[in-house]
């Protein structure tokens, strides 16, 4: 069903859900409009009320806070929707940056817009775009991915799915997983250009620019602290063409043997070769085992 929202000229019996960005490190990045909105709404739904309370104290915001995070989003979200339906205005904030981006909030936005509610976004701080524009890597087109899976095996699967994308790719990463993630990127994406940023907008803001292998060298020698944003160069046409054609001169048997030489079992190698060739595994299996 089509739903039209005239944010400032429309009429609605329900309240408005405001999506209010908060600073990603430097408190001076809080906008006048964000402060005014947080002061004027009936309640602030916060990912971490303790963190938001500190922000409110700085700007003398006395609006009541309600907890809304990943572990209570269903129960708290239902309560917030009921408040909105009754005509109350609610502001949604995350700990830092824009709500719903690698943070809870997308569900409540969908639920409220599905019933015709007005959702008004405010512009403001965002770590991904802040890192991108200063990365030195082509800023557009870009693809924002956020956090990779914490499990090493699943992380590699995700990178495999991303390796042919030609857009600049933006990731978030925690300090204790940075080295493992960089190693997985080097293995799967190759030695591309990358900009690693940490402590954006804070006193110790830092950019580390270079190839993935160079950044791995830095990570092995430096102390890893802070929250990281990684801006990675996309694939180029030559890389894609080379990847698609490298095996074309090989027989199916030689193709399987190539993967076995890289450490794969015969079963894994047959599966990989079948995927490359876009043929049934049985066809590759038969070709590999002939005359053996």
From Swiss-Prot:
Q: Write one Gene Ontology MF term.
A: rRNA (cytosine-2'-O-)-methyltransferase activity
Q: Where in the cell is it found?
A: Cytoplasm
Gene3D superfamilies associated with the record: Cobalt-precorrin-4 Transmethylase, Domain 1, Methyltransferase, Cobalt-precorrin-4 Transmethylase, Domain 2
The record's annotation in InterPro entries points to: 4pyrrol_Mease (IPR000878), 4pyrrol_Methylase_sf (IPR035996), 4pyrrole_Mease_sub1 (IPR014777), 4pyrrole_Mease_sub2 (IPR014776), rRNA_ssu_MeTfrase_I (IPR008189), SAM_MeTrfase_RsmI_CS (IPR018063)
Q: Does the keyword S-adenosyl-L-methionine apply?
A: yes
What reaction does this catalyse?
cytidine(1402) in 16S rRNA + S-adenosyl-L-methionine = 2'-O-methylcytidine(1402) in 16S rRNA + S-adenosyl-L-homocysteine + H(+)
Signal peptide (from-to): none
One GO cellular component this record assigns the protein to is: cytoplasm
Q: Alphabetically list the UniProt keywords.
A: Cytoplasm, Methyltransferase, rRNA processing, S-adenosyl-L-methionine, Transferase
Supply the EC number(s): 2.1.1.198
Q: Which family does it belong to?
A: Belongs to the methyltransferase superfamily. RsmI family.
Q: What does this protein do?
A: Catalyzes the 2'-O-methylation of the ribose of cytidine 1402 (C1402) in 16S rRNA.
Q: Which named protein is this? A: Ribosomal RNA small subunit methyltransferase I
Organism (species): Bacillus subtilis (strain 168)
């Amino acid at each position: 069903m089509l739903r039209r929202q005239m944010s400032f000229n429309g009429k609605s019996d329900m309240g408005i859900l405001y999506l209010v960005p908060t600073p990603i490190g430097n408190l001076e990045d809080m906008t006048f409009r964000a402060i005014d909105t947080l002061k004027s709404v009936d309640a602030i739904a916060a990912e971490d009320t303790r963190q938001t309370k500190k922000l409110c104290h700085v700007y003398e915001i006395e609006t009541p806070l309600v907890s809304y995070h990943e572990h209570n989003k269903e129960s708290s979200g239902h309560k917030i929707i009921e408040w909105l339906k009754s005509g109350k205005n609610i502001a949604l904030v995350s700990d830092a940056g824009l709500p719903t981006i690698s943070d809870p909030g997308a569900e409540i936005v969908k639920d409220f817009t599905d019933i015709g509610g007005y959702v008004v976004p405010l512009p403001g701080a965002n770590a991904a775009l802040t890192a991108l524009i200063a990365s030195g890597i082509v800023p557009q087109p870009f693809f924002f991915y956020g956090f990779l899976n914490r499990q090493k095996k699943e992380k590699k699967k995700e990178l495999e799915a991303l390796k042919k994308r030609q857009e600049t790719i933006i990731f978030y990463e925690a300090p204790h997983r940075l080295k493992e993630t960089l190693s997985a990127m080097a293995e799967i994406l190759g030695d591309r250009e990358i900009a690693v940023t940490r402590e954006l907008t804070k006193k110790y803001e830092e950019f580390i620019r270079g190839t993935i292998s160079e950044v791995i060298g830095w990570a092995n020698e430096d102390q890893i602290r802070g929250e990281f944003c990684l801006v990675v160069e996309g694939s180029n046409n030559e890389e894609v063409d080379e990847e698609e054609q490298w095996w074309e001169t090989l027989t199916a048997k030689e193709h399987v043997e190539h993967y076995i030489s890289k450490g794969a079992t015969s079963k894994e190698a047959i599966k990989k070769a079948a995927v490359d060739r876009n043929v049934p595994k049985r066809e590759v299996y038969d070709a590999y085992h002939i005359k053996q």
